């Protein structure tokens, strides 16, 4: 989660109680390492770790953005599956806009993706999300 969210009054304070892994998106390598190290620790403590591989919402017409490899590396290192989740919130909650449009956000949860190759895990998750995204938009 981008660390800027944690300083939003009330909302950020409440979210911080969930022990999120906050990252500085300007420091990409440091942030990736933090997700891998802190995410691995959380998994070993019994927590589920939610990774947003694109890093931001997009408009449906912009399609799926570039995926970071953190989800594949984390799943491979910790020998846990990736549970892909796809949603269309970008259709109503436009990025960099205060305005939120009303509508139903669809969320689809896929089957576990299991493997040991981080790149293949990431690509399989991306492929499923891309296909599902086109179906729900």
Predicted regions and their residues:
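Catalytic core of membrane glycerolipid acyltransferases/transacylases, capturing the structured
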Residues: 1-29
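Non-catalytic C-terminal accessory region of glycerolipid acyltransferases
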Residues: 33-137
């Amino acid at each position: 989660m981008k660390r800027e969210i944690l300083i939003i009054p009330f909302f950020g304070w409440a979210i911080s109680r969930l022990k999120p892994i906050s990252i500085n998106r300007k420091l990409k390598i440091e942030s990736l390492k933090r997700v891998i190290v802190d995410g691995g620790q959380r998994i070993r403590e019994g927590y589920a770790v939610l990774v947003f591989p694109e890093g931001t919402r997009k408009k449906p017409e912009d399609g799926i953005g570039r995926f970071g490899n953190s989800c594949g590396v984390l799943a491979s290192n910790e020998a846990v599956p990736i549970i892909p989740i796809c949603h269309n919130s970008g259709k109503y909650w436009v990025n960099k806009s205060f305005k939120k449009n009303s509508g139903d956000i669809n969320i689809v949860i896929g089957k576990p993706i299991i493997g040991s190759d981080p790149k293949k895990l990431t690509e399989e998750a991306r492929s499923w999300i891309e296909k599902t995204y086109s179906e729900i938009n």
